[in-house]
From Swiss-Prot:
The keyword Cytoplasm applies. This is Profilin. Occurs in many kinds of cells as a complex with monomeric actin in a 1:1 ratio. Binds to actin and affects the structure of the cytoskeleton. At high concentrations, profilin prevents the polymerization of actin, whereas it enhances it at low concentrations. By binding to PIP2, it inhibits the formation of IP3 and DG. It comes from the Eukaryota. On the 2D-gel the determined pI of this protein is: 4.5, its MW is: 14 kDa.
Length: 23
């Protein structure tokens, strides 16, 4: 999992990551 700062959709991918972690 990588976040490219300033890339459109980064927040959405972050949300998906947190869901995968069960947070």
């Amino acid at each position: 999992y990588m976040v490219i700062q300033g890339e459109p959709g980064a927040v959405i991918r972050l949300g998906d990551y947190l869901i995968d972690q069960g947070l």
